[in-house]
Amino acid sequence: MPASPSASASPFRVVIVGAGISGLYMAETLKRAGIDFTIYEKADEVGGTWRENTYPGLFVDVLSRQYEFLFDPNYDWSRKYAPAAEIQAYIVRTAKKRGWYQYIRFNSEIVDARFSGGAWHFKTAKGETDTADVFIAATGFLHKPIMPNIPGRESFAGPSFHSARFDHSVPVKGKRWGIIGSGCSGIQITEALAWQGCEVTQFIRRAQWIHIRENPRTTLWERIKLRLPGMYKRKQRELWDFIIKGDAWRLKPGPQRDAMQAEFRTYLDAVKDPELKKKLTPDYHLGCTRIPKSDQNYYAAVQLPNVHIVKGSVARIHPDGVEMADGTRHKLDVIVYATGFDTHAYMRPMTVTGLNGVTIDEVWKDDIYSFAGVGLPGFPNMFLLYGPFAPLNNVPVPVGLEQEIGYIMKAIEAGRAKGAAVAPTAAATEKFRERMRAAFPGTVWVGCKNWYIDSKGTPILWPLRQDEHGKLLAELHEEDLEFVPARAGAQGKAEPREAARAGSA
């Protein structure tokens, strides 16, 4: 039976794990709704991936305005695609302005989250404990760097580090740099070091389709214009429409997809050496992997005399460099592992335990999945932000977050009305997964190996239009939910401090 209110009932609380953009968006929503919450952050500052990644040449890979909180616009981006430090500075500035810091416990990594007695119980790496009614996992999926299992890696005599842990104490000039990896970070680091005159060797196993883009500075008039009455909202609507229509080629074959493929081939035509061009030409179609963005003309950079592209697998690390699978050796002073992240980890390595002692590791042992990117059966009152099947590539980040958070808030209130904790049913989750599986054929994300794919070859991102994502999350269907007893105090309705919707400023 649902719990009944009592004099000793604990106040309704939410714990958010992660103080990146998603966690902070959720914080503002809860704050306005009058719901008590605490954010646990393993690092010493907000920002998430923008705090962690500081490597040379890092620019946002989508338009700067796609990383704005809708309730706190920034009219003064320096460029169309802002440098990473500017994104991070905006997040910090907004967090201070909005008063979020008072809710955050920094240097507090949650290592265990367990649902028991109708509530979530948390333990930090320091041994501290906490209890809350709702658990929001806002950890993201680009937080656990992958270091390749290459023999001899620890024997290298010089500095070596992952791109997400870039060591800025290492002098850039006068070093022979080795960049292992050809994804977004590998491309941006290579071109940044190349134009500084460094000796750079990039080791790639697979070529990428690379977007050579222009990144102009924002003019004073553009900044002034956004401040005119009604102009910002108009420009945002135009931007969302442009993104949604412009990304339609990802969802189905047709002339738009053919035109995009042709455009990217023209970028490659800038490489004049036939042998180098062959190394840099992918053997799969455009969009199957995430498309690296080049702000400093990668194809021009790799044709500089100080840059070398080596195609193949690194077989061994030696104290003075690397050895390839074909036996060739390359002497290096510094190695950067631009080898990406464990994108299927999500909130792990945290141990998360739901009903009947079942852990997230057991549930995700064979396949990574969720209900609509926000919930999992068997884990009452645990909600994910940008979980499996989230709209990573075809919905603007603020829009996707508002849609997810809107659904989560409705689910929380539905549970509180019944004195219960809620989770999606197994049937609703399987129905959702069937819809996702049916939609993937014909999209660009099938047909090659990429980090979007689960163990059965199904991509775990949103394969439909933006409006369908909004429609899915716009209404709460109680028949899709399981209600389980919550602890005393979980009943009632929050008294809003401000407008309940975070984007209504």
Identify the residue ranges that each predicted region occupies.
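Alpha/beta-hydrolase fold catalytic core
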Residues: 258-331
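Glycine/threonine-rich phosphate-binding loop and adjacent beta-strand/alpha-helix elements that clamp
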Residues: 338-412
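C-terminal, flexible cofactor-proximal segment of oxidoreductases
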Residues: 209-212, 370, 383-505
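Feature captures the FAD/FMN-dependent oxidoreductase FAD-binding
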Residues: 79-143, 316
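Rossmann-like dinucleotide-binding core of oxidoreductases
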Residues: 11, 16-32, 36-45, 130, ...
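FAD-binding beta-loop-beta segment adjacent to the flavin cofactor pocket
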Residues: 51-60, 151-154, 294, 299, ...
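Beta1-alpha1 glycine-rich phosphate/pyrophosphate-binding loop at the start
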Residues: 12, 16-101, 204-205, 270-275
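Short beta-strand to alpha-helix junction loop
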Residues: 74-93, 251-258, 285-297
